[in-house]
């Protein structure tokens, strides 16, 4: 996310890509051409040094493991009165799984577990849920029973959470929430967002509008260093064709 006007964006594009004939910048297309790599770096340097920016880097595999813990582990502990999220335990356990899981459990088998989890969340059928439980049981799960025991033992709380309508492994909303959290911190007052046309944004348009319209004063703290306060300073989110806006 970059706080920049169309005129300034056009000027930077002309300055760093004077020979470019395309109506819009496409990173993947430019990055494939060696002659454009240095201008890309210089453009990024100019934007980062001269304008307010929010950059969000997401490791999708780590995020998937976090989601696995949210739905295939946490409900088991909640049912027994344990706060799985206390002191960032979910992040610590996700980091452990991400780092040692492939070595301790076998790379292929661990990958199969994550794939089975994605399929179970998407399909929500008894067959897909059984396949997830079987994938967990094929692992040497007693090596990490606190993370793998609930699903390996077929915890009904976890299976019910995974089968809940609306539960998804889509990372788009996580990214949107993270960007919004940081933009709220950086913005001195009301602001609006213009976004390139996106199916993901259309999917979450109604939810974003509910966020924007929320008037009750409340703060949600995601971690020790991240929180978001309502009402938002964000006033609107609109989609535009990037061919018509630099």
Which stretches of residues belong to each language-model region?
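An N-terminal structural lobe/cap that precedes and organizes the functional/catalytic core
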Residues: 1-33, 38-55
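A two-mode feature
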Residues: 57-246
């Amino acid at each position: 996310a970059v706080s920049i006007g169309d005129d300034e964006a056009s000027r930077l594009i002309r300055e760093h890509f004077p020979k470019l004939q395309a109506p819009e910048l496409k990173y993947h297309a430019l990055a494939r051409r060696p002659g454009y790599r240095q201008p890309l770096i210089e453009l990024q340097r100019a934007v980062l040094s001269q304008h307010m920016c929010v950059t969000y880097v997401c490791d999708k595999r780590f995020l998937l493991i976090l989601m696995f813990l949210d739905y295939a582990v946490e409900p088991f502990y909640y049912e027994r009165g344990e706060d799985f999220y206390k002191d960032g335990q979910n992040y610590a356990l996700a980091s452990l799984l991400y780092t040692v899981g492939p070595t301790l459990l076998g790379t292929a088998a661990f990958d199969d577990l994550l794939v089975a989890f994605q399929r179970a969340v998407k399909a929500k059928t008894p067959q897909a849920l059984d396949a997830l439980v079987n994938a967990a049981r094929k692992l040497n799960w007693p090596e990490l029973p606190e993370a793998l025991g609930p699903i390996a033992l077929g915890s009904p709380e976890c299976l019910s959470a995974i089968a809940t309508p609306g539960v998804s492994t889509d990372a788009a909303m996580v990214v949107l929430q993270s960007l919004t959290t940081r933009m709220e911190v950086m913005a001195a007052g009301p602001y609006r967002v213009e976004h390139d046309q996106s199916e993901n944004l259309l999917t979450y348009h109604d939810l974003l509008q509910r966020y924007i319209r929320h008037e009750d004063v409340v703060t949600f703290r995601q971690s020790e260093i991240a929180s978001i306060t309502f009402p938002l300073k964000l006033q609107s989110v609109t989609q535009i064709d990037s061919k018509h806006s630099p």
